[in-house]
Amino acid sequence: MTHKVEVSGSTLTKRYTSWSRDEPAREWAALVLLSQEAPDLVPRPLTLSTDPSLTMTVLPGQPLSGSLTASMQTALGDALDTLWSVPPAGLAPIDLPALVARTRSGLTALCDGDGVIAKAAYTWLDNQPPDLTVVRDPVVAHGDPNLSNYLWDGTRIRIVDFEDAGLGDRTVEIANLVEHLAGRETDWAPLVRRLAPEPDRFRWARCLWAGFWLTLIGPGGPSADRNPPGTAETQAQRVLRLVAG
């Protein structure tokens, strides 16, 4: 857990418990920009303290979860279109090179195992995605598309949790959403058709994120014990399918 949350009336204070990636500054910068350019899409930032903590307004809605309905996907597409319509001026870039390096390192470690997880790690490393670190379509990258970070009020969706935000690539961000473990119950095809990412780049970006997730939930990963038995094996099969094209 990177933070704790305290709610008092119409305000919320987020107290960071770790900030090695400069999370407080990233979140503050993103919220300041977005609250000016896209009012009511994100919380309005109020204060940033050195402890560090960030106080912001509370947004209406309930976190998304499970399988998204067509209405929810439409609203999510609207929210993402609004988010990505804002020029990412002044935001620090997403550190995609660090993600790639971390994924390679984690998958290399998984090669020491056996079974489908080791096979997927070997296969990914033998078919590594091309360089995705050059930003072709710059956007405000949310950075953490866990479904719980999208608040649904029955009509529209608002977005929270920008501690990993920055300047990023639109196609890579779409792949990040589709490959997030929290979204596995949803058929993302309608939203992907609407957002229309560059096909080849999208496929390779999905491979990157799928490999990253395997390093998180595979043996020895930081989230290895947070999911039901068989989750890592299922993820390994997903990696193999994506790499195969």
What are these regions (language model features)?
Residues 16, 59, 146, 163, ...:
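Anionic group-transfer/hydrolysis microenvironments
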Residues 29, 72-73, 158, 175-178, ...:
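Glycine-rich, phosphate-binding/catalytic loops in enzymes
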Residues 86-143, 232-242:
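An alpha-helical support segment within catalytic cores of ATP-dependent transferases
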Residues 35-38, 83-91, 132, 181, ...:
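A general structural signal marking secondary-structure boundaries and capping sites
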Residues 171-198, 207-226, 234-238:
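Active-site activation/catalytic loop segments of kinase-like enzymes and analogous catalytic loops
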Residues 3-7, 127-172:
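Active-site acidic catalytic loop and adjacent metal/ATP-binding pocket
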Residues 2-95:
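ATP-binding pocket architecture of kinase catalytic cores
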Residues 51-69, 85-88, 104-110, 211-227:
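A glycine-centered beta->alpha junction motif in the catalytic cores
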